[in-house]
Amino acid sequence: MIDNLNEEQKLAVTSTEGFIRVIAGAGSGKTRALTHRFAYLVNEIGIMPSNILCVTFTNKAANEMRSRIKKLTGDNDTGYICTFHSFCVSVLKEDSNAVSFPKSFLVLDNSDINAMLQIIYEERGLTLREMTFSNARDMIEMKKLKEIPKYYYDLINMSLDEIHNKYLNAKKTDEIIFYGYLYQQKKCFGLDYNDLIKFSLYIFQENEEIRLKWQQRLEYIMIDEFQDIDEIQYQLMEVLCDYHKNLFIVGDPDQTIYTWRGASVKYLLDFDKQFPNVQTIFMLKNYRSSPQIIQTANSLIQKNKNRIKKDLIPVISENKNPFFAKTVYFHAKSATQEAQFIADECQKLMENGVSGDKIAVLFRAHYISRSIEEVFQEKKIDYTLFSGLPFFERIEIKDSLSYLRMIAFKDDLSFLRIVNVPKRNIGERRILFLKEYVENHGGSLFDALKLNIDNEIFSNTQAQSFIKLIEDYNKTYENMQISELFSHLLNSSGYERMLRTEGSQERLDNLAELKQAIYEYEVSCGEECNLENFLSHVALYSNSDLNVNKNKVNFMTIHAAKGLEFPFVFIAGMNENMFPSKKIDSLSAMEEERRLAFVGYTRAEQRLYLTEAEGFSEAYGFRFPSRFIFDVDDCFLDYKVELSDSLKQKSRNYIEESDKNLEKMEALIDLSPGDKVTHNILGNGKILEIDSVKKTYLIQFENIQTPRKMSFKAPIKKL
């Protein structure tokens, strides 16, 4: 059974007792080791499968592991091979009486939650403009994880009437939605993913008999992707392994990329400090990628300081494949040229017999895909976009383009989309009035609004200001550049302010990318540069019909690519403030960005391409090449375009200044409200509030009458 394993894998498989930590590099065969270890426990040691818990982080990975183990053991009983959430469903199905829930409780998915939200919104007269269902789901999750972590005591111990009263008495939108949701949950005995682990922990904490039963049952516990574990999962693991004390974990600290979701690399790094006599095994031989790709990835990740020092070791011979070559680095003069390069290289690969689905174009965030999508559509290269809408299908892009279209055409579709965005108190009742008027008298909905503006139905609305907005720009837009019109319109309409109020950085990034698309159109279109032609140009991209077949290039974020591998990988948008993201505000967050780049690099099997482009945008200023390119030794990169000494120096200066700012911000992380600080110019003061979202302090200085809101970058020190 273990003859085909390497020495490190054999050691991992046959080390069965105690606390064992496996540091497994990308492509090192950790799944193979896990499945063989399970089979070894069953076939060689004689352990019953039902006494083994093997945890993975996705249902897909669990199904794949279950299938492999079944082949190795020949036994249909594969025990508990599942995610943490699936395991908790098993616990709750068996012991739901401990939380006064029936065994037939529901596990809620997003569609179930949306249906509950629909009921709440209708009952309390809420609208999607106040909070979308997506934002409501996020808000509920944040309240359960951070703001009201003991919420489950209410759900378990309160009667249905008591929760209902909390819901009815709630005044704020988020409280109405949250307690309305808890009421709907209790009403149908439904539990979402956050509840499953919380309820299981509650049972184990409150009922010693049930806890001991599960502890004794699970003689061996194995956990995959341990670098992605969060605090509550860690607590569950501690409880479960506390009887037999057999815990086997596998992880790679260089692939911790989910700290924003609660994951913490400290659980893997400090494992030997938390448990006694830990045996650590290193599995570093990489069976996936070419030696050239491994050199690139190693060179990159070595720049991180908070890590276990290790290098991947390539196993595949350098001469094994004609496609093997140095990592390609292409510096473009524009985003369009970058997209053209990616498309051209993909076409060359496909002309040489490579199937499109063997190619992946990866990026840090979805907005980066816009210019690449355009070129792929022009060249009729089929692609599939994972985990996201095509650029021109995104809500904020459709809304913005509808404003432009409304200025040019005053059409009903655009009117219906934007008349109440941002909120102008022109809801369904008033829209129905306009539709009935048009049906009886003809004309457009906008005309109907103008003709009926004095009707009392439109009192207490902002209908008049909307009419003025459209009419004013309709008279002047032909004398304005499209980019100028777009910027003014976003500002005058209040649309951009609405997004900023919502705090949706990704949607603002997408608006910035649309601005960039308009600039590029203005530069390239010549005499035909007018609003009507631009809208037609965009419509072509919005309505392109790509052929449906399996031979499609994969477009996805690096987060979505985690756990996948492709022979050929392009990573686009390798610019400062794009990758690494401009949202990075600490040295530890920058190290996570570098780990994300490492994950991206190690998705490639045969050839890796890194691309970026020069340019300027309102969102980012001048675009410099990413530090994640400079982190790689020059000898490992095939420069398709040599960088000028001037650009190299400016880039390094920018990165150096960025690092200094991160160091300053890191030094301020331990500040709290009430702390006394000193400012280089304003003197001594006291912190009143800290806004971690806007990254500001509210400080009352001794020599100033009113408090000042200061950036995290302000020159202050703790006294």
Model-derived features with residue positions:
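Short glycine-/polar-rich loops that comprise or flank the Walker A/P-loop
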Residues: 18, 47-51, 77, 243-245, ...
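Conserved helicase C-terminal RecA-like lobe
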Residues: 163, 167, 369, 373-378, ...
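P-loop NTPase Walker
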Residues: 1-103, 107, 114, 188, ...
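Conserved helicase NTPase motor core
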Residues: 3-14, 18-23, 33, 53, ...
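Helicase P-loop NTPase motor core
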Residues: 22, 28-34, 276-279, 284-382, ...
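C-terminal accessory regions
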Residues: 574-703, 710-715
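ATP-hydrolysis module of ASCE/P-loop NTPase motor domains
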Residues: 15-16, 21, 76-79, 97-195, ...
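Short alpha-helix plus adjacent loop in nuclease-associated cores
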Residues: 87-95, 254-259, 288, 387-408
